[in-house]
Design a protein with these regions (language model features):
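Active-site histidine-anchored catalytic micro-motif
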Residues: 89, 94, 98, 104-142
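Short, active-site-adjacent cap segments at secondary-structure transitions
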Residues: 21-22, 102-104
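N-terminal glycine-rich anion-binding loop in soluble enzyme alpha/beta folds
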Residues: 13-78
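Short, Lys/Arg-enriched N-terminal segments with co-localized hydrophobic residues
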Residues: 1-8
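Short, charged beta->alpha transition segments
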Residues: 75-86, 111-113
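A short glycine/small-residue-enriched secondary-structure motif
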Residues: 53-60, 83, 88, 115
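Residue-level preference for short coil/turn positions at secondary-structure junctions
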Residues: 8-10, 89
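A short helix-to-beta-strand connector/capping loop
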Residues: 10, 29-32, 120-125
């Protein structure tokens, strides 16, 4: 029989954006669910898959050559689908978000989480609010 700590840890899923400072291998090894940011090179959009489709060095080389490059956040709908897939399994979500001082992703995640909490009342007791507070401990400019 698992001890109490193991049972508690199995009741939630860690979640993050592809902006997290971890490799895809580490994320997958620890069962962390992730949602990708977007980026463009010369008008062609890609999902951030940890540099597998286009290595990060190629993105930066394109910038250096003068290509039109930009990044964009995960939108509310993408966060909603990401969170819904986890909540549908009966799991709570501990999501670590990109800083609200650098991206609108935090706000999009909050909006999606609110909808998920309304649709999955059991999620009211989850760790999501705590995780969202964690990202505010260190200001983006500091």
């Amino acid at each position: 029989m698992p001890n109490r700590k193991e049972v508690l840890l199995s009741e939630y899923v860690l979640s993050c954006c592809s902006t997290v400072d971890l490799t895809r291998e580490k994320i997958e090894a620890h069962g962390i669910k992730w949602v990708p940011f977007h980026y463009e090179i010369d008008g062609k959009e890609y999902l951030d898959d940890f540099g597998e489709t286009i290595p990060y060095d190629d993105f930066y080389a394109a910038m250096a050559k003068g290509s039109a490059t930009k990044t964009s956040q995960v939108n509310v709908g993408e966060f909603y689908e990401h969170f819904k897939a986890i909540a549908s399994e009966g799991k709570d979500i501990l999501h670590i978000s990109f800083s609200s001082g650098l991206s609108g992703a935090y706000g999009s995640a909050e909006i999606a989480a609110k909808t998920i909490r309304e649709e999955f009342p059991r999620a009211q007791r989850n760790c999501y609010r705590f995780a969202m507070r964690v990202v505010r401990i260190r200001p983006a400019h500091g």
